[in-house]
Amino acid sequence: MSAGKPKQEFFALEREDLVHLEKQRAFVHELARRLDLSPSFSGNVGDLQILQKIVDASALSASQTWELQSLGIVLGDVFASQHGLRWVMVEDEYGRDPALRFQNTSNLVFPLTMISKRIEDGKEVDLQAIYEGVSAYIAEFTE
């Protein structure tokens, strides 16, 4: 047996997955409203500014993993709408997580933890830089 990448399987989002993602989006919308930010997320790059304001306000602590990952879902919605990716569930030896898939390829982006891991590790979160870096990575999918 070769030591390589863990085997990944892709699945369409099931109803339960859709409900969970919608709960996470609703949490972020409500948090933005409570912070007097425009809670109108549209999937465009302007959403990055709202997410950055939430992060900069330190509205969530490093221990609030689900809530921080909810920010990652909204970030993922920006990648999806701007780069033609679609949400899928990816299952491997480590578990089952939402990811963004490029067409029917194995090219994936995992936005769920892009914000949470940085905050949990005490690192700066620059959403514009994250967006630009991941966008460059996504551009390689079409080369």
Residue ranges: model-predicted function:
Residues 2-65:
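N-terminal low-complexity, intrinsically disordered segments
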Residues 4-5, 21, 77, 81, ...:
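Generic detection of intrinsically disordered/low-complexity segments and helix-coil linkers/edges
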Residues 13, 18, 28-30, 89, ...:
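Domain-length accessory/inserted modules outside core catalytic folds
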Residues 40-43, 47, 70, 74, ...:
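A sequence-level detector of short, solvent-exposed, charge-rich linear segments
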Residues 54-58, 82-83, 118-122:
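Generic structural signal for hydrophobic core residues of well-folded globular domains
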Residues 66-118:
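Amphipathic protein-protein interaction modules
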Residues 102-143:
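A recognition module on extended beta-rich or small alphabeta surfaces enriched in W/G with H and D/E
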